[in-house]
């Protein structure tokens, strides 16, 4: 199958993820539980990552595991800005934009210092409220960052993470 076809299938699956992974509500306790779930997976699998769960106006959860770097923290911020701007998964945008340089097209006027075209940011969509924030992971290859977030969010909201997972690249 051609790369373009693979991307189209992955984009379709990510759209299904975004439609299925809706929180009934989200408060500080939910954010802590979800963040701890991601951290537990990372510690068990020895993944060096940084984790951020934020609403548009404030951070609710942050953690880093052994192996995470200061660069990962900066990537969290830039991925958050992308989710805030577009209200979709950052990996979806990576596949839609199909750019090797990880920068948005110049006509979008998005400074690379503030916006990263890289997987690992996922919108927090609350039933009846819409997108209110983002769950972000940084430290793994971008598809793995995305898959880790989707797995944890799916488990948190009672969806089957296997059914929603992207196929191996």
From Swiss-Prot:
Transmembrane segments: none annotated. This is UPF0303 protein BOV_1367. Belongs to the UPF0303 family. It comes from Brucella ovis (strain ATCC 25840 / 63/290 / NCTC 10512). SUPFAM superfamilies: GlcG-like (SSF143744).
